[in-house]
């Protein structure tokens, strides 16, 4: 028990009790056996100075009551349960103690463990370790998902799907089984569905990434673009499609362009198409309605122009022009209109002009109109119009009009009009209506000469 008061004669009614009037005052507040030092006060107890208690000496025991004060300075006994002020708290738990939803506004549904809805209205989480920052009508149903904000965005549940992100926008959707590491930045009505892994749409409207195989697909922006080939990319534009059946297709921009096969590239333009079972590393830079197609068509190239075609040819090139066709491997058309290298014209070239045809391997037409190399061996027409090399070949027409070589090897017509060389190792320089039918013959010029 505490000792009795000392110096009682010094204690007077209404006066302060000094520290030396009481012995063992420290023990009374710090001893282990507190019952021996109980202090009872009837009436009011007023402290005008500071009160200090050593924190380590406080008893740590659960009690149903605490002391509290209000702005009048009075002390009250309160239930500990009254400290949970649900009305004034900004956040509260959702379906259990392991998730958080706003308390003072909105309607929310959070059933995910360790998940948080920070703001907005009518947002819903039923995936674990997920987060919705703001917006309305957003839903995150897979684990480790993130929706930053926006309206009616959805990350829906699927077998073994997790770790997906929608930053914002409206009506964007991530769905399907095995859909991991997917991303939609913003925009409207963009979808990533039924892909395995690693799909991303940065923005735009009504863009779609889909396919039941592969991953690594990307759409930058634009409208109504589609990627369903592994590692396929559409940077922008509208109505572009990187189709399945291959991998690594690329469309830069433009409208209604399409690719099918391994690593095809369409940089831009409109209605350009690369398609075929074994297309690899073919490219169309621009233009309109240009096509590279066929069962086998590798490393072919169209630079631009209108309605140019490379059907089933490897390493073929059309630089530009209109309605040109390169059907042979390693063939070349520089430009012009309606020029063609047929399927038998391997390693042949038409530089320009109109309606020129190279059907012989390793042949060359520089330009002009309606010139034809249809010989059995490589030959050359430099230009002119309506000139023809047929027969054995290894022949040359420099230019002119309606000149024809149809004989054996090594024949030459430099120019002129309506000249014919059906000989062997023979030469016509120029003139009109000249004809050679012999061996090792020459007509330098003139009209209606015969050799």
Give names to the regions the model predicted:
Residues 1-80:
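Extracellular "spike/adhesin" assembly and maturation modules
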Residues 83-451:
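Periodic small-residue-enriched repeat registers in elongated scaffold domains
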């Amino acid at each position: 028990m505490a000792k009795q008061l000392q110096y009682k004669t010094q204690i007077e009614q209404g006066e302060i009790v000094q520290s030396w009037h009481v012995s063992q005052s420290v023990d009374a507040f710090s001893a282990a056996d507190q019952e021996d030092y109980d202090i009872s006060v009837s009436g009011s107890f007023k402290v005008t100075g500071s009160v200090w208690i050593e924190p380590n000496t406080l008893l740590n025991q659960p009690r149903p009551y605490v002391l509290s004060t209000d702005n009048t300075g009075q002390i009250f006994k309160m239930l500990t349960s009254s400290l949970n002020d649900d009305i004034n708290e900004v956040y509260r738990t959702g379906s259990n103690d392991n998730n958080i939803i706003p308390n003072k506004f909105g309607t929310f549904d959070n059933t995910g463990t360790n998940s948080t809805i920070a703001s907005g209205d009518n947002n819903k989480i039923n995936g674990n370790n997920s987060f919705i920052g703001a917006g309305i009508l957003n839903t995150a149903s897979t684990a480790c998902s993130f929706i930053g904000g926006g309206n009616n965005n959805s990350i829906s549940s699927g077998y073994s799907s997790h770790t997906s992100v929608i930053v914002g926008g409206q009506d964007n959707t991530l769905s399907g089984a095995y859909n991991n590491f997917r991303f939609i930045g913003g925009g409207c009505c963009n979808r990533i569905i039924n892909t395995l892994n690693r799909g991303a749409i940065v923005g735009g409207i009504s863009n779609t990434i889909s396919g039941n195989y592969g991953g690594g697909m990307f759409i930058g922006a634009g409208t109504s673009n589609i990627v369903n080939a592994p590692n396929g990319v559409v940077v922008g534009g509208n109505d572009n499609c990187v189709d399945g059946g291959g991998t690594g297709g690329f469309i830069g921009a433009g409208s209604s362009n399409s690719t099918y096969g391994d690593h095809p590239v369409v940089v831009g333009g409109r209605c350009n198409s690369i398609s075929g079972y074994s297309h690899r590393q073919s490219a169309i830079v621009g233009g309109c309605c240009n096509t590279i197609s066929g069962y086998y068509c590798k490393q072919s190239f169209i630079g631009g122009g209108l309605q140019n075609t490379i059907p089933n040819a490897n390493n073929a090139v059309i630089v530009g022009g209109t309605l040109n066709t390169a059907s042979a491997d390693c063939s070349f058309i520089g430009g012009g209109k309606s020029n063609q290298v047929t399927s038998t014209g391997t390693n042949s070239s038409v530089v320009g002009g109109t309606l020129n045809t190279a059907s012989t391997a390793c042949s060359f037409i520089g330009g002009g109109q309606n010139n034809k190399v249809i010989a059995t061996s490589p030959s050359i027409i430099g230009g002119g119009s309506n000139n023809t090399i047929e027969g054995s070949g290894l022949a040359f027409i420099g230019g002119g009009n309606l000149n024809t070589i149809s004989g054996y090897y090594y024949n030459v017509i430099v120019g002129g009009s309506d000249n014919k060389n059906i000989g062997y190792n023979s030469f016509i320089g120029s003139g009109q209506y000249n004809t050679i039918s012999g061996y090792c013959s020459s007509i330098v010029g003139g009209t209606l000469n015969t050799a």
